[in-house]
């Protein structure tokens, strides 16, 4: 299910205009890229604030309706107030179906409890990364990538090359030769000493 956003064109610009907009419960933003010019928009702050809490909102193709005209976009940047629960500005990028996009998607770790290094050795899994950058066409964009930890033993590490990706999805870091760690299983401290004392 695609997430939909409603917006309106924004005519007034500048700090004063944006402050007035926020006082009315509206949020200034911009949409750029694709085949169109950059366009200033305004959105409902409350609606966007709650959508930003959705994981999928950050790693999905979104449908934005600007004055009734729909476009496909990606969330690119969010500026938050330093201490208030307030979004100050939001950026979206248009996507073209025939053009690859680079997006950070979250990692969902599963089966940690049945990993031999946890179940048998009492080790602990450390998530080195919680998201990774991928490259693909918009139609192939996954909401998340599942990381199966069931085979991990004490002292082992899962790398980017161990991730199972759907077809047509690439990890740019791997193409550059950077096979970065994703998760490690840390052995229980003093395990060897404890077993020898017994």
From Swiss-Prot:
The keyword RNA-binding applies. InterPro entries: Rbsml_bL25/Gln-tRNA_synth_N, Ribosomal_bL25/Gln-tRNA_synth, Ribosomal_bL25_b-dom, Ribosomal_bL25_C, Ribosomal_bL25_long, Ribosomal_bL25_short, Ribosomal_L25_dom, Ribosomal_uL5_bac-type. Keywords: Ribonucleoprotein, Ribosomal protein, RNA-binding, rRNA-binding. Signal peptide: none annotated. Coiled coil: none annotated. GO terms for cellular component: cytosolic large ribosomal subunit. GO terms for molecular function: 5S rRNA binding; structural constituent of ribosome. GO terms for biological process: translation. Belongs to the bacterial ribosomal protein bL25 family. CTC subfamily. This is one of the proteins that binds to the 5S RNA in the ribosome where it forms part of the central protuberance. Part of the 50S ribosomal subunit; part of the 5S rRNA/L5/L18/L25 subcomplex. Contacts the 5S rRNA. Binds to the 5S rRNA independently of L5 and L18. NCBIfam families: bL25_bact_ctc (TIGR00731), PRK05618.1-2 (NF004128), PRK05618.1-5 (NF004130), PRK05943.1 (NF004612). This is Large ribosomal subunit protein bL25. It comes from Nitrosomonas europaea (strain ATCC 19718 / CIP 103999 / KCTC 2705 / NBRC 14298). The lineage of its organism: Bacteria, Pseudomonadati, Pseudomonadota, Betaproteobacteria, Nitrosomonadales. The gene is rplY.
């Amino acid at each position: 299910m695609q997430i939909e956003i409603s917006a309106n064109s924004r005519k007034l610009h500048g700090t004063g205009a944006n402050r007035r907009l926020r006082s009315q419960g509206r949020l200034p933003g911009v949409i750029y890229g694709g085949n169109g010019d950059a366009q200033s928009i305004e959105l409902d702050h409350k609606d966007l604030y709650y959508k930003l809490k959705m994981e999928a909102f950050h790693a999905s193709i979104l449908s934005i309706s600007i004055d009734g005209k729909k476009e496909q976009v990606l969330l690119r940047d969010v500026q938050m107030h330093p201490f208030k629960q307030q979004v100050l500005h939001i950026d979206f990028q248009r996507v073209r179906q025939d053009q690859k996009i680079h997006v950070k998607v979250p990692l969902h770790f599963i089966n940690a409890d049945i990993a031999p290094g946890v179940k048998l050795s009492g080790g602990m899994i450390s998530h080195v990364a919680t998201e990774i950058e991928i490259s693909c066409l918009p139609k192939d964009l996954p909401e998340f990538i599942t990381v199966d930890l069931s085979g991990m033993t004490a002292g082992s590490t899962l790398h980017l090359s161990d991730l199972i990706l759907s077809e047509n999805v690439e990890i740019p870091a791997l193409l550059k030769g950077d096979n970065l760690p994703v998760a490690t299983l840390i052995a229980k401290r003093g395990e060897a000493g404890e077993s020898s004392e017994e």
